[in-house]
Design a protein with these regions (language model features):
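Catalytic active-site module of serine/aspartate enzymes centered on a nucleophile-bearing elbow/loop
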Residues: 265-299
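Short beta-strand element of the alpha/beta-hydrolase
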Residues: 54-62
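Short beta-strand/loop motif that positions the catalytic acidic residue
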Residues: 223, 229-231, 235
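N-terminal cap/lid segment of alpha/beta-hydrolase-fold proteins
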Residues: 25-51
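Conserved alpha/beta-hydrolase
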Residues: 76-100
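Alpha/beta-hydrolase active-site loop
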Residues: 106-130
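Short alpha-helix in the alpha/beta-hydrolase fold that links the catalytic acid
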Residues: 72, 225, 239-249
Length: 299
């Protein structure tokens, strides 16, 4: 079945099976600027909050030096989800130092990824203090580099109850760099290469950098919270088929991990003009948070 057709069918099934009246939400929301401490520096962000949120999320950045993602946060708030989004460490109004470049040793070495996970964890704690209803599920949503940061963060904080990962790797940092150097930014890469070829190079090419690799599987293996990965098949930043291969191994073991593949999309699945990935993520969050609430009420 065509992957895009499958994605739209999945969205339709979610829509007809979900009791949407539970999540009726006006488009009104408030925006409140906040500051919080993390590892000795002050980070600045904004909380975008609808009147009666059914869930809350912290947005976790990709590797670039980016400020808070207000446009995405507003889209989430209009769907009934409270969001804390902040300027990345060393960017905008946030203190500290941005560790760059975005492609290179120090940006994705274990020290920096752990530091960024501490920032995300402190953001979760901060967001919780601004929620009137302390019982609503809180999760993490992120892009690209967040594929390493989110599992680390979720391991640090048992109050994180779900995760949504757009174009995020499930392979090691060194493997991702091998693939990225192999594709070399060529948007036509997949016209002349196969998945088998890409996987072979990702697993066996010599490393241009030498540092301790971070393997998200070490953290995902200890998690029992639901997770959704959304991939673009034309991605030239991460080897999607290899990432899916890793997720399938977790699924066989009973992990509550799901993924959706979009044949026409590349790396920026959440920011693409095609809103299907975003729409599917919203319906998934609604379904999972409803399940979480049922589980809590039955205890």
């Amino acid at each position: 079945m065509n992957n895009n057709l499958f994605s739209k069918l999945l969205l339709w099934l979610l829509l007809i099976t979900l009791p949407v009246t539970v999540f009726s939400q006006s488009t009104e929301f408030t925006i409140q600027d906040v500051k919080f401490e993390s590892q000795g520096v002050t980070l600045a962000g904004s909380i975008i909050k609808p009147e009666n949120p059914f869930a809350a999320v912290v947005f976790v950045h990709g590797s670039d030096p980016v400020k808070r993602e207000m446009a995405l946060a507003k889209r989430l708030a209009k769907e009934g989800i409270a969001v804390l989004t902040y300027d990345k460490r060393g960017v905008g109004e946030s203190g500290g130092v941005y560790v760059g470049p975005s492609v290179g040793t120090n940006n994705i070495d274990s020290t920096n990824l752990n530091l960024l996970s501490n920032d995300a964890n402190e953001a979760v704690k901060t967001l919780q203090t601004y929620l009137k209803n302390k019982k609503i599920p809180i999760g993490l949503i992120g892009v690209s580099q967040a594929g390493w940061i989110i599992p680390i963060t979720a391991n640090k904080n048992p109050q994180i109850e779900f995760m949504v990962l757009f174009s995020c790797p499930t392979i090691t940092t060194l493997e991702q760099l091998r693939f990225q150097f192999y594709t070399n930014g060529n948007n036509n890469f997949w016209e002349n290469h196969t998945d088998a070829d890409a996987i072979e190079h990702t697993k066996n090419d010599p490393d241009k950098y030498q540092f301790e690799a971070t393997d998200p599987k070490n953290y995902l293996s200890t998690l029992s919270i639901p997770g959704l990965w959304l991939f673009g098949e034309k991605d030239i930043q991460i080897p999607v088929k290899l990432c899916i291969e890793q997720l399938n191994k977790f699924k066989v073991k009973g992990k509550p991990f799901e993924y959706t593949l979009f044949s026409a999309l590349g790396h920026n699945t959440v920011f693409d003009n095609d809103t299907t990935p975003f729409d599917i993520s919203i319906q998934w969050i609604k379904q999972k948070t409803l399940n979480l609430k049922k589980t809590k009420s039955s205890k």
